[in-house]
Amino acid sequence: MHDTEFETRAAELIEAGRFIDGRGWVPATSGNFSARLGDGRIAITVSGRHKGRLRPEDIMLVDAAGRSLDGRKPSAETLLHTGIYRRYPEAHAVLHPHSPASTLLSRLVSGAVILEDYELLKALAGIDTHATRIVVPVFPNDQDIPRLALKIEEYLVRHDGVHAYIIAGHGFYTWGKSVADALRHVEALEYLFDLETRMHGVKR
């Protein structure tokens, strides 16, 4: 019996991977992607796969707690995905690139990146004017993923209007109501992060 919704979401994640890799935002086997299905299961990339060369067998299923449903090993950062889905019931996709601008910017600032008065902010869900200000928190990297996931989830619970967060020296996470929405956020945010690095005098 075919799991049609899973197959559809897997195809969308594969396409997103090709797009993101084509821009150099997931080098080597970095990054991880997921999509939440209607029944609460989560389609997520298998650990260690190159995101620009994903195949259907490179997408697996986990439950809402991040436990494998097919015996394979999910992304090392699965708990960061499940935390986002708990905090945002409307979210049905999470994308995590290791993009150059977000990684570099996290070396230039501490605590948070402030994005303000950019027209492209309107690419983010719920924003309809450039005259706005969003805070993108920057968290120190941590190889203890459960500890990092708890710290991030606690922040997200306390703060409204968060569209993304950066892990220092690592990359960023963003989410949306669909894979297409999350991908739009990735593209817009990486552009804005690049502009912010230039404002710090860094030429790319």
From Swiss-Prot:
Binds 1 zinc ion per subunit. One of its GO terms (molecular function) is zinc ion binding. GO terms for biological process: L-methionine salvage from methylthioadenosine; pentose catabolic process. Zn(2+) binds at H96, H98. Keywords: Amino-acid biosynthesis, Lyase, Metal-binding, Methionine biosynthesis, Zinc. Its EC number is 4.2.1.109. InterPro entries: Aldolase_class_II_sugar_metab, Aldolase_II/adducin_N, Aldolase_II/adducin_N_sf, MethylthioRu-1-P_deHdtase_MtnB. GO terms for cellular component: cytosol. The keyword Zinc applies. It catalyses: 5-(methylsulfanyl)-D-ribulose 1-phosphate = 5-methylsulfanyl-2,3-dioxopentyl phosphate + H2O. Pathway: Amino-acid biosynthesis; L-methionine biosynthesis via salvage pathway; L-methionine from S-methyl-5-thio-alpha-D-ribose 1-phosphate: step 2/6. It is an enzyme of class 4 (lyase). NCBIfam families: PRK09220.1, salvage_mtnB. PANTHER family: 3-OXO-TETRONATE 4-PHOSPHATE DECARBOXYLASE-RELATED, FUCULOSE PHOSPHATE ALDOLASE. Catalyzes the dehydration of methylthioribulose-1-phosphate (MTRu-1-P) into 2,3-diketo-5-methylthiopentyl-1-phosphate (DK-MTP-1-P). Belongs to the aldolase class II family. MtnB subfamily. This is Methylthioribulose-1-phosphate dehydratase. It comes from Methylococcus capsulatus (strain ATCC 33009 / NCIMB 11132 / Bath). The gene is mtnB.
